[in-house]
Amino acid sequence: MVAASRRKLQRSTVVNEKTGAYDVHPDRTSSGTHFERAENELVARIERRISELLGVPVENGEPIQILHYTPGAEYRPHWDYFDPAHPGNEKVLAMGGQRVATLVMYLNDVESGGSTVFPDVGIDVLPRKGNAVYFAYTTVDGQLDRRTLHGGSPVVAGEKWIATKWLRERAYAPASA
């Protein structure tokens, strides 16, 4: 996946909570690309495994994002869910409802830095090839869990490659351009 991603990389974006546009933002300095659902046999196999493991229909997943971090690149602490109080999030919420969980898969070992940190709960996950971290965003009473604040620490040496799968409450159907 890394080799297939290299030629497609672009600066990563975030959803602008005011407009719903996808904007480059200084809090997120990685590059990335994505693979559409079942774009190739490897992607289809990964998506089936995620679905079986987590008990979530394949259709509820956003495209697999491949993210690349070079030395100094990071993603400052943020939430992956969309705050419904922000007007720009209406567009992304219409594409399958709220994001409910994230799966981050580590595609390589990082020489130094690049851990996934959860500052509010004191968890620091080292990026090790073949490992993954999964987290859901709702509390037992169905509220969005602000303790899922997380970030990608700056890479100090080497590079970091991850595959991220965001899961929605319903089938994901992006709006037509």
Residue map of PLM features:
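Fe(II)/2-oxoglutarate oxygenase catalytic core
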Residues: V2-A177
